[in-house]
């Protein structure tokens, strides 16, 4: 979202440019809203990148244990000891049988990828959104512009994030042969080559482009309903972000299952499907999932995915908007001083 002064039309009806306040109307505004309205209508690229990096790191750090469970639930042929019926039960069993810190294995590599990936993502999204809104709609927000901007930003995000996804998902699997991110990177590099880190890239894009399109279009629509003036409103960001993330997650679960299979290359599942060597390509992944589990296989882990994405997107939006607000306000204050 862009920093706005009370809505698409900048100066909203409740605020007069000449400072005239009738019936005590100006006094009813809280200081935070007034401060936000006085900020510039757009933030700098460095602000978008810093706020985006913080949002990505905090989002993935907080939700990482649930992400670990989701990865295991999407396994096509899990070990009998790694069959779970609920997220809580899975986390409890993993910590009891594999160690308290086991659900966090791979968090370090995820944080290293999430920071720069989200920094580029939000910076690209904000600038593309502003440019495309001028092209598609001169009166305000265009849902088409938001969807296209999110899709374009996804290309940059996934280029950085895909190698981190490959490593962290292999570390998350039950009985993983890798004990650390470094050993996983070294083994994959030596045995499968550089291409292994991008084997699921096309599937990742095929999943994330519709995911982000649904996410941003839904988010902007909900913002119009719960926050029509587009003020800085953390509660509206949390609600809109959470619901948009849940809907997008449910709709794209089949693609996420295929991505997980391409990333993890489950040996037992591939042998049951008579796949020799390494599985590659989205079409092959779709065919293998159906061969092993039928239509139900495409929705393995949907509960964990929705439960993961709903708070994740809520955290991401609220943290991003908070840091963007703080950083832009500080830049404005420094500019005023000098």
Curated annotation (Swiss-Prot):
Annotated segments matching region Disordered: 1-37
On whether rRNA-binding is a keyword of this UniProt record, the answer is no
Topology term for the membrane: Multi-pass membrane protein
> Which Gene Ontology cellular-component terms appear in the entry?
mitochondrial inner membrane; mitochondrion
Q: What happens when the gene is disrupted?
A: Erythroblasts generated from murine embryonic stem cells null for Slc25a37/Mfrn show maturation arrest with severely impaired incorporation of iron into heme.
Q: Which Pfam families match?
A: Mito_carr
Annotated membrane-spanning segments are 45-64, 106-125, 143-162, 200-219, 234-253, 301-320
What terms describe the molecular function in GO for this protein? ferrous iron transmembrane transporter activity; iron ion transmembrane transporter activity
**Major subcellular location class:** mitochondrion
What is an annotated GO biological process for this record, any one? iron import into the mitochondrion
Q: Which cysteines are joined by disulfide bonds?
A: none
Q: In which tissues does this protein get expressed?
A: Highly expressed in hematopoietic organs, fetal liver, bone marrow and spleen.
Looking at the record's lineage, which domain of life comes first? Eukaryota
**Where found?**
Mitochondrion inner membrane
Q: Where are the Solcar repeats?
A: 43-131, 141-225, 232-326
Q: Which reaction does it catalyse?
A: Fe(2+)(in) = Fe(2+)(out)
Which of UniProt's keywords are assigned here? Ion transport, Iron, Iron transport, Membrane, Mitochondrion, Mitochondrion inner membrane, Repeat, Transmembrane, Transmembrane helix, Transport
What PANTHER family does its record include? MITOFERRIN-1, MITOFERRIN-1-RELATED
User: How would you summarize the oligomeric state and partners of this protein?
Assistant: Interacts with ACB10; this interaction stabilizes SLC25A37 and enhances the function of SLC25A37 to import mitochondrial iron during erythroid differentiation.
- Family per record: Belongs to the mitochondrial carrier (TC 2.A.29) family.
Q: What does this protein do?
A: Mitochondrial iron transporter that specifically mediates iron uptake in developing erythroid cells, thereby playing an essential role in heme biosynthesis.
Protein name (Swiss-Prot/TrEMBL)? Mitoferrin-1
Protein species of origin: Mus musculus (Mouse)
Q: Coding gene?
A: Slc25a37
């Amino acid at each position: 979202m862009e920093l706005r002064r009370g809505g698409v039309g900048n100066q909203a009806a409740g605020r007069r440019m000449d400072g005239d306040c009738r019936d005590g109307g100006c006094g009813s505004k809280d200081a935070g809203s007034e401060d936000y309205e006085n900020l510039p209508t757009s933030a700098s690229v460095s602000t978008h990148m810093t706020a985006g990096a913080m949002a990505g790191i905090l989002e993935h750090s907080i939700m990482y244990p649930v992400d670990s469970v989701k990865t295991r639930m999407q396994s096509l042929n899990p070990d009998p000891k790694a069959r779970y019926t609920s997220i809580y039960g899975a986390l409890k069993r993993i910590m009891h049988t594999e160690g308290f810190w086991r659900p966090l294995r791979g968090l370090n590599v995820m944080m290293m990828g999430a920071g720069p990936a989200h920094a580029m993502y939000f910076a690209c999204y904000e600038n593309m959104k502003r440019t495309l809104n001028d092209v598609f709609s001169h009166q305000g927000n265009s849902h088409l512009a938001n969807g296209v901007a999110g899709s374009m930003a996804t290309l940059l995000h996934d280029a950085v994030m895909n190698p981190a996804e490959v490593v962290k998902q292999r570390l998350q699997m039950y009985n993983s042969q890798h004990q650390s991110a470094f050993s996983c990177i070294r083994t994959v590099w030596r045995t499968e080559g550089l291409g292994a880190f991008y084997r699921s890239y096309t599937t990742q894009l095929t999943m994330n482009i519709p995911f982000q399109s649904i996410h941003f279009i839904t988010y902007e629509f909900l913002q119009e309903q719960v926050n029509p003036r587009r003020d800085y409103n953390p509660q509206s960001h949390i609600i809109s972000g959470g619901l948009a993330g849940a809907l997008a997650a449910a709709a794209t679960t089949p693609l996420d299952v295929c991505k997980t299979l391409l990333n993890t290359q489950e040996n037992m599942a591939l042998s049951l499907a008579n796949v020799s060597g390494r599985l590659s390509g989205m079409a092959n992944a779709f065919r293998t999932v159906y061969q092993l589990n039928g239509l139900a296989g495409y929705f393995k882990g949907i509960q964990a995915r929705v439960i993961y994405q709903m708070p994740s997107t809520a955290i991401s939006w609220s943290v991003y908007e908070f840091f963007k607000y703080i950083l832009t306000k500080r830049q404005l204050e420094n500019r005023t001083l000098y």
